[in-house]
Every structure is written in C-alpha cells, then in structure tokens.
C-alpha cells in the first residue's frame, strides 16, 4: 500500500462529547471492540459502519500485534488472522481515512507500545489524528511513559485513555484517574481479556472509587460477555461498557459475507441492555 495519506481535519465526535450525550440520555455508553483486519480490512470497514448503525456509541479498534500480552486466546487469534491478511498500522489508518464522512462516532485505537514506539510517538499521534481517531489505549504503557505520551496526544486532539486494574494500589489508581483523558478504563478482572460468566463484585466499589478520584467517566472492560454483564455494569454506576472477546467470537463464527450483519445483531442486543 502507498504511504500514509493525510486527509483534512477530524470530523468525528470527541469522546467527551459522546459521553455527555449518553449521560444526558440516562444510559450506559456501549463501546464494542474489534480487531482491525480480522478477517480483512474490507470486512472491518463494513463492521464499523454496522456497529454505528446498530447503536454503538464509540468503537475500540485493535491494531494487530504479534505478542499481545493483555489479550486472551480469542483476541490473540483475531490478531493472528489480521496479521496473516497483511494488516499494518498504516493500512488501518488508511481504512479510517476512507471511511471519513461515513463513520461519525469516536474511534479509539487499541495498540501496544511496540507498534507505537516503532513508528515514533509523535508520528503515530500525527497520523492517528489525521485519520480522525479520537483516542488511544495502550495497555502495556507504564504510567510514567503515559505522562510523556499524553501531552503529545492531547496537542493533536487525541485522548490517551489509561487503564486501572483491580490490583492497582489506591494511590496509583488516583494518579491514573487524574491523568487519564476521555475516560478511565477499569479492567474488571485480573488477567487477560476474555469472556467471563461472572465478574468480580469488587469492581462495583472500584467504579465508585474512581469516580471520587477524578472527573472522568468510567468504562468497564475485559470479561463482559453479553447483555447480562452490560446490565450489571450499568447497575454499578459505570458510564460505559467495553465488549471485545464476545463480539470477536461472534464475528469469527459468522458465515462469509455475514460478519457485519452478525456484529450488528449482537450490538443491538448489547445496546438494549445499556438502556
């Protein structure tokens, strides 16, 4: 593929404006995750549009990486399929450029530090902003490195979203909540991504703790497998629910040509549970 092409200014909604809209409607923000390039970027583009049409408020889009330490087997397999189809960060960004004018909800890139540092933090942020990306999630980025990246991202209109785990010490949790932009990402389980039939009850108290620690909305991810967990997250007082492995699994099981349709049907089920 040709080198990255820079388009005109960002036309997507911001993360903050979307949360404000959702909160005004008195419901939970639905934030599906999918892996870019699984099974190919053409299908990814179709799924992104289907998710928006089916009620998604924001979309977390994974950039495939060969050693995804935070991901469970479902998303690892999706990353492997995406890499096998020739997906690269540049191609993912070009796909988003091609969707300009069609996709209006915020897109948040989920990437590991290796692709980010290989491209260079400033260059990566420049290109993400030009592609209309609203934010970044970098799960293996230490807080100290995040404090270097966040100003670079903010200067380009990107929110660097930071993660908090159930095992994060209270003092560090407060620092993360204060430093995160857009929202604070609360990991609901200890371990890697993946569906869980039951989520830890302690997460409910962590939601409230994070809300007291900063002004950001709190979105819960990792382990949300369906509408029941979405309703549970809503009852805890969280502002958003991120659903990844369950959606990726549904897409992988769909018949060729029906992936976007299947993703949209599942998204509608989740949106109904979100309020």
UniProtKB/Swiss-Prot annotation:
Q: Extract the GO molecular function terms from the UniProt entry.
A: tryptophan synthase activity
CDD domains hit by this protein: Tryptophan_synthase_alpha
Q: Which reaction does it catalyse?
A: (1S,2R)-1-C-(indol-3-yl)glycerol 3-phosphate + L-serine = D-glyceraldehyde 3-phosphate + L-tryptophan + H2O
Q: Where is the active site?
A: 60 (proton acceptor), 71 (proton acceptor)
**Does the keyword Lyase belong to this entry?**
yes
Q: Which InterPro entries match?
A: Aldolase_TIM, RibuloseP-bd_barrel, Trp_synthase_alpha_AS, Trp_synthase_suA
| Gene Ontology cellular-component annotations | cytosol
Give the pathway listed in the UniProt entry for this protein: Amino-acid biosynthesis; L-tryptophan biosynthesis; L-tryptophan from chorismate: step 5/5
Q: Which Pfam families match?
A: Trp_syntA
**Lyase found in the keyword field:** yes
Top-level taxon of origin: Bacteria
Query: What PROSITE patterns does its record include?
Result: TRP_SYNTHASE_ALPHA
This entry's Enzyme Commission designation comes to: 4.2.1.20
Keywords of this entry: Amino-acid biosynthesis, Aromatic amino acid biosynthesis, Lyase, Tryptophan biosynthesis
Its function? The alpha subunit is responsible for the aldol cleavage of indoleglycerol phosphate to indole and glyceraldehyde 3-phosphate.
The entry's family comment says:
Belongs to the TrpA family.
Query: What binding partners and quaternary form does the record give?
Result: Tetramer of two alpha and two beta chains.
Name by which UniProt lists this protein: Tryptophan synthase alpha chain
Which organism does this sequence originate in?
A: Prochlorococcus marinus (strain MIT 9313)
